[in-house]
From Swiss-Prot:
This is Ubiquitin-related modifier 1 homolog. It is found in: Cytoplasm. C-terminal thiocarboxylation occurs in 2 steps, it is first acyl-adenylated (-COAMP) via the hesA/moeB/thiF part of the MOCS3 homolog, then thiocarboxylated (-COSH) via the rhodanese domain of the MOCS3 homolog. Signal peptide: none annotated. Acts as a sulfur carrier required for 2-thiolation of mcm(5)S(2)U at tRNA wobble positions of cytosolic tRNA(Lys), tRNA(Glu) and tRNA(Gln). Serves as sulfur donor in tRNA 2-thiolation reaction by being thiocarboxylated (-COSH) at its C-terminus by MOCS3. The sulfur is then transferred to tRNA to form 2-thiolation of mcm(5)S(2)U. Also acts as a ubiquitin-like protein (UBL) that is covalently conjugated via an isopeptide bond to lysine residues of target proteins.
Amino acid sequence: MVKVKIEFSGGLELLFGNQKQHDVDVPVQEGKQLTAGHLIAWTRDNMLRERPELFVKGHTVRPGILVLINECDWELSGATESTISDGDVVVFISTLHGG
């Protein structure tokens, strides 16, 4: 298990029970590392309450959602292949707003 703090903002929290912060234990296979892609799939399957099309597209987040791992843009560390470790903070921020 990997202990991760997940935060949602920019309206994404509405898809996750209207709760912005979650402390979760994510299972990983023996000898494997948790990746951001695996975390997204686990979050979709275990935490998402409604409208998955607003959070995921294929095996990643929808365009317009920023992902920060320990305050760093995940694009700098490999996006879905970024490694997530015990105690990491992963933030999902929607930049899309209706109008």
